[in-house]
C-alpha cells in the first residue's frame, strides 16, 4: 500500500481550480497530491519571428520553481542569471504538449504563453504543469472567442500528462518524490483525451526494462489520463 492508502494504479488526490488569477486570460491552480503548480495563460497580439507572416499563431510555455517549493530554499534562476537545463527541457515539453492540442492557424497571428510556476514540489511537476496549463489555455482561447476574433475554435483535442514507473518491481501510477527517487523505471506520458500519444519520456535506472513492462506502464498511464481528462472537463465547466 502506498501513501494515503493508494493502490499501485491510483492517482494522487487531484484538484484543478480554474480562474484563480483576475489578470490572466486563463488560469488554473493544479494539485497532484502535494505537488502544486500555478498555470496562467496570457494572450499577446504578436508572434515570434519564425511564425511571422504565415498567418498562424503560436503557443509556448515558461516553467519555474519558487525558491521554497522544495525542502530547502533554491536560489531563483533570475538571481543566477541563467536557466538550468532541466528548466529549459520542461518548458519546451509543456509548449510541445500544448501545441498538440490546437490548430495554430486557427489561433491567428497571436501568441498564447503558458506560465507554469511550481509552488510546492513532490514529484511530477511537469505532468501537473501540462495538465493544468491545458485548462488555462482553453480559457484563454475562450477569451479570444468572446471578442469575436476567431472564425473557428482552435482547440482540437485535450492534452494531459502523468508519470508512471516501476517501483519495487511493480507498476506505479503518478509517482511522488520518494517513489520517483527509488523507481527502477521512471516515465512521463503525455497524451490526448482520445488516448493518442504526444510524448513519452522513459528512463531505466540500473537495469533495462522489457517491452511487456513498457506496455503495462503505458496502459496504466492511459487509464490515469482518462481520469485526468474528466477532471479537466469538470474544471472547464466551472462558472
UniProtKB/Swiss-Prot annotation:
SUPFAM superfamilies: Ribonuclease PH domain 2-like, Ribosomal protein S5 domain 2-like
Enzyme Commission number(s) from the entry: 2.7.7.56
Record's keyword terms, sorted: Nucleotidyltransferase, RNA-binding, rRNA processing, Transferase, tRNA processing, tRNA-binding
The UniProt record lists the keyword tRNA-binding: yes
PROSITE patterns: RIBONUCLEASE_PH
Binding site for phosphate: 86, 124-126
Coiled coil: none
GO BP, one annotated term: rRNA catabolic process
Keyword tRNA processing recorded: yes
Domain of life of the source: Bacteria
Reaction(s) the record says it catalyses: tRNA(n+1) + phosphate = tRNA(n) + a ribonucleoside 5'-diphosphate
Function: Phosphorolytic 3'-5' exoribonuclease that plays an important role in tRNA 3'-end maturation. Removes nucleotide residues following the 3'-CCA terminus of tRNAs; can also add nucleotides to the ends of RNA molecules by using nucleoside diphosphates as substrates, but this may not be physiologically important. Probably plays a role in initiation of 16S rRNA degradation (leading to ribosome degradation) during starvation.
Family: Belongs to the RNase PH family.
Classification via NCBIfam families: RNasePH
Quaternary context: Homohexameric ring arranged as a trimer of dimers.
Protein name (record): Ribonuclease PH
Amino acid at each position: 500500500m502506498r501513501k494515503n492508502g493508494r493502490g499501485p494504479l491510483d492517482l494522487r488526490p487531484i484538484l484543478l481550480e480554474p480562474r484563480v488569477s483576475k489578470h490572466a486570460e486563463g488560469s488554473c491552480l493544479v494539485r497532484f497530491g502535494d505537488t502544486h503548480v500555478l498555470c496562467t495563460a496570457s494572450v499577446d497580439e504578436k508572434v515570434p519571428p519564425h511564425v511571422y507572416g504565415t498567418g498562424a499563431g503560436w503557443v509556448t510555455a515558461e516553467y519555474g520553481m519558487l525558491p521554497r517549493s522544495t525542502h530547502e530554499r533554491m536560489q531563483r534562476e533570475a538571481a543566477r542569471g541563467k536557466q538550468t537545463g532541466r528548466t529549459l527541457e520542461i518548458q519546451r515539453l509543456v509548449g510541445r504538449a500544448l501545441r498538440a492540442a490546437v490548430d495554430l492557424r486557427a489561433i491567428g497571428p497571436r501568441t498564447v504563453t503558458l506560465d507554469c510556476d511550481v509552488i510546492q514540489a513532490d514529484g511530477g511537476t511537469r505532468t501537473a504543469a501540462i495538465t493544468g496549463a491545458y485548462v488555462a489555455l482553453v480559457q484563454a482561447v475562450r477569451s479570444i472567442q468572446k471578442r469575436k476574433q476567431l472564425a473557428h475554435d482552435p482547440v482540437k483535442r485535450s492534452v494531459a500528462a502523468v508519470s508512471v514507473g516501476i517501483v519495487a518491481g511493480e507498476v506505479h501510477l503518478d509517482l511522488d518524490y520518494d517513489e520517483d527517487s527509488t523507481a527502477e523505471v521512471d516515465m512521463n506520458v503525455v497524451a490526448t483525451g482520445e488516448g493518442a500519444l504526444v510524448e513519452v519520456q522513459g528512463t531505466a535506472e540500473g537495469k533495462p526494462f522489457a517491452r511487456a513492462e513498457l506496455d503495462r506502464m503505458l496502459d496504466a498511464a492511459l487509464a490515469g489520463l482518462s481520469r485526468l481528462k474528466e477532471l479537466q472537463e469538470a474544471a472547464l465547466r466551472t462558472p
